Amino acid sequence: MPIKTIKIMVEGGNVKPGPPLAPTLSQLGLNVGEVVKKLNEATSSFKGMSVPVTIEVDSSTKKYEIKVGIPTTTALLLKEAGASEPSGDPAHKKIGNLSLEQVIKIAIMKKPGLTTKSLKAALKSMLGTAKSIGLTVDNRDPKELVKEVEEGKYDDLLAKYENEWNGVKE
């Protein structure tokens, strides 16, 4: 029972039954409409974002499994900030503001795809991305917050989310 793996990026909740997906699914003998419907259901919580998806197909039984990945950090930060795209000039043109708690929640969401072992390190990574796309956090430059996170200023806040962080499977 050879397993065929298809890795694609789709728009959350808006997968269309066209190329390049449809021909690949048809070649494997799958019902394109059914797979697209299941993909849209599986990715609906990431509406409007680019989402990595893996479809594993058993070519002998035609059974398949859809595994939804997590959108990029940039996509999650932009969605949370209500912005459509990163700033072309992040040093001078800010596109939105997030609270530190919003950034912590995104760090927790991204845990399975991160190499960092602690919530503190993950938060610093998210803050770096926020800075690079032109977001402020708590109406401040994220670089300032990284320094304060390193100094332990937010350890109490991070402790509040530690159980949630530890509960996420890697």
Curated annotation (Swiss-Prot):
GO terms for biological process: translation. GO terms for cellular component: large ribosomal subunit. InterPro entries: Ribosomal_uL11 (IPR000911), Ribosomal_uL11_C (IPR020783), Ribosomal_uL11_C_sf (IPR036769), Ribosomal_uL11_CS (IPR020785), Ribosomal_uL11_N (IPR020784), Ribosomal_uL11_N_sf (IPR036796). Keywords: Ribonucleoprotein, Ribosomal protein, RNA-binding, rRNA-binding. It comes from the Archaea. GO terms for molecular function: large ribosomal subunit rRNA binding; structural constituent of ribosome. Pfam families: Ribosomal_L11, Ribosomal_L11_N. Signal peptide: none annotated. Part of the ribosomal stalk of the 50S ribosomal subunit. Interacts with L10 and the large rRNA to form the base of the stalk. L10 forms an elongated spine to which L12 dimers bind in a sequential fashion forming a multimeric L10(L12)X complex. Belongs to the universal ribosomal protein uL11 family. PANTHER family: 60S RIBOSOMAL PROTEIN L12, LARGE RIBOSOMAL SUBUNIT PROTEIN UL11M. Forms part of the ribosomal stalk which helps the ribosome interact with GTP-bound translation factors. This is Large ribosomal subunit protein uL11. It comes from Saccharolobus solfataricus (strain ATCC 35092 / DSM 1617 / JCM 11322 / P2) (Sulfolobus solfataricus). The lineage of its organism: Archaea, Thermoproteota, Thermoprotei, Sulfolobales, Sulfolobaceae. The gene is rpl11.
